[in-house]
Swiss-Prot record:
Belongs to the influenza viruses nucleoprotein family. It holds the Pfam family Flu_NP. GO terms for cellular component: helical viral capsid; host cell; host cell nucleus; ribonucleoprotein complex; viral nucleocapsid. A motif (Bipartite nuclear localization signal) lies at residues 198-216. InterPro entries: Flu_NP. Homomultimerizes to form the nucleocapsid. May bind host exportin-1/XPO1. Binds to viral genomic RNA. Protein-RNA contacts are mediated by a combination of electrostatic interactions between positively charged residues and the phosphate backbone and planar interactions between aromatic side chains and bases. One of its GO terms (molecular function) is RNA binding. The gene is NP. It comes from Influenza A virus (strain A/Swine/Netherlands/12/1985 H1N1). This is Nucleoprotein. HAMAP family: INFV_NCAP. Keywords: Capsid protein, Helical capsid protein, Host nucleus, Host-virus interaction, Ribonucleoprotein, RNA-binding, Viral nucleoprotein, Viral penetration into host nucleus, Virion, Virus entry into host cell.
């Protein structure tokens, strides 16, 4: 994608930095993950967790959620103004799992948010370190993307459940900033905009007055974020129409759904970052590694290397398959929920199976689940190769569309074709090409029709040996061209419920 001079790399978005050179970026991202690690170590001390308990991913998630909740200004303000029964607005907590006499026990802890904020700032040189918080949000979002389906949310906004590959980042909180916006899929942005437009249709005052002015600014900003994800002129022109609409209504919703469908073939640019659980950074910091001095990148070899050398455990329910649990977390760590399974399998070095075939539920354990029968096992998060994460949709040629398959948004910059069922996608585009966006619609449909499923994306890009940290010898895998690799195929996962 032709990058404008003003574009910042994701690492800059991630660290809130202005333009920096590669070394500065690596140092500031290193500082960010180092701060997360220091915070985690301190929390383990506070909670008196053993080494094993500190490596338990469920404990990591509870600690991450506590710090996110402690810094959630808007919600904290809301909780103070609307006191609800049994919720202390000044406290945060969750389940911590400890091993007693060979059995796992659940212990509910409560902390002052103020205290958590103090520990976090102390670990981050006295600063709020919002970038680190966003990083944790993206890790949780990637975990949700790999674990749950969003069929219901898609249907509610009038979209087709088969468009799930466009839903990356759909559970990210609004406050996740530029780094969060970069990882949101086209479908996620479309859904946020449709919800906004629907509120405007139902509530006469939504766009009016001082509040309405702020709403309008937010609407236009979201439109611009979505526009920036599209790579063809016609899609961008349609976004301009949606943004400039005087009074957004059903016509805009139609246009947005049309654009979302078109993104199945004319894919948008969506960033991918390997965000790891806090306990992984904690382990590495505890071993004496200096992230800031060594530098770190979310899109290169570094996360692979960390996972190669860290042992993380997970609680396992009686009928779950530990290998499947590992696959789920591996995909979340690399933000690969929407990647082609052929590519993921090749990089991981073991077969990555569609979600419908996984014998595992989510990573988090509900408060009513029986701990008596819980076991724990090591998560296998290592890989055979590493590959560079991409922020492009893998379209073969800037203006011409490439093939896309219902359910792929590439994560790794690795050569492959993106098989798709053209008939299925094109069937959605019959009829309506009239109205003010008719010429753009016609142009978009023309580009989609010329797309070929056998076209190769990421020409010449390959994976690398884990010893090849400078990425000098790409190994270009050859894939069975017909075999399609959708993770969500034949899906039976549970829905994401807040």
């Amino acid at each position: 994608m032709a990058s404008q001079g003003t574009k910042r790399s994701y690492e800059q978005m991630e660290t809130g930095g202005e333009r920096q050179n590669a070394t500065e970026i690596r140092a500031s991202v290193g500082g960010m993950v180092g701060g997360i690690g220091r915070f985690y170590i301190q929390m383990c001390t506070e909670l008196k967790l053993s080494d094993y308990e500190g490596r338990l991913i469920q404990n990591s998630i509870t600690i991450e959620r506590m710090v996110l909740s402690a810094f959630d200004e808007r919600r904290n303000k809301y909780l103070e103004e609307h006191p609800s029964a049994g919720k202390d607005p000044k406290k945060t907590g969750g389940p911590i799992y400890k091993k007693r006499d060979g059995k796992w026990m659940r212990e509910l802890i409560l902390y002052d948010k103020e205290e958590i904020r103090r520990i976090w700032r102390q670990a981050n040189n006295g600063e709020d370190a919002t970038a680190g918080l966003t990083h944790l949000m993206i890790w949780h979002s990637n975990l949700n993307d790999a674990t749950y389906q969003r069929t219901r949310a898609l249907v509610r906004t009038g979209m087709d459940p088969r468009m799930c590959s466009l839903m990356q980042g759909s559970t990210l909180p609004r406050r996740s900033g530029a780094a969060g916006a970069a990882v949101k899929g086209v479908g996620t942005m479309v859904m946020e905009l449709i919800r906004m437009i629907k509120r405007g249709i139902n509530d006469r005052n939504f766009w009016r007055g001082e509040n309405g002015r702020r709403t309008r600014i937010a609407y236009e900003r979201m439109c611009n974020i979505l526009k920036g994800k599209f790579q063809t002129a016609a899609q961008r022109a349609m976004m301009d129409q949606v943004r400039e609409s005087r009074n957004p209504g059903n016509a805009e919703i139609e246009d947005l759904i049309f654009l979302a469908r078109s993104a199945l073939i004319l894919r948008g640019s969506v960033a991918h970052k390997s965000c790891l659980p806090a306990c992984v950074y904690g382990l590495v910091v505890a071993s004496g590694y200096d992230f800031e001095r060594e530098g770190y990148s979310l899109v290169g070899i570094d996360p692979f290397r960390l996972l190669q050398n860290s042992q993380v455990f997970s609680l396992i329910r009686p009928n779950e398959n530990p290998a499947h649990k590992s696959q789920l977390v591996w995909m979340a760590c690399h933000s690969a929920a929407f990647e082609d399974l052929r590519v993921s399998s090749f990089i991981r070095g073991t077969k990555v199976v569609p979600r419908g075939q996984l014998s595992t539920r989510g990573v988090q354990i509900a408060s009513n689940e029986n701990m008596e029968t819980m076991d724990s096992s090591t998560l296998e998060l290592r890989s055979k190769y590493w590959a560079i994460r991409t922020r492009s949709g893998g379209n073969t040629n800037q203006q011409r569309a490439s093939a896309g398959q219902i359910s792929v948004q590439p994560t790794f910059s690795v050569q492959r074709n993106l098989p798709f069922e053209k008939a299925t996608i094109m069937a959605a585009f019959t009829g309506n090409t009239e109205g003010r966006t008719s010429d753009m619609r016609t142009e978009i449909i023309r580009m989609m029709e010329s797309a070929r499923p056998e076209d190769v994306s990421f020409q010449g890009r390959g994976v690398f040996e884990l010893s090849d940290e400078k990425a000098t010898n790409p190994i270009v895998p050859s894939f069975d061209m017909s075999n399609e690799g959708s993770y969500f195929f034949g899906d039976n996962a549970e829905e994401y419920d807040n």
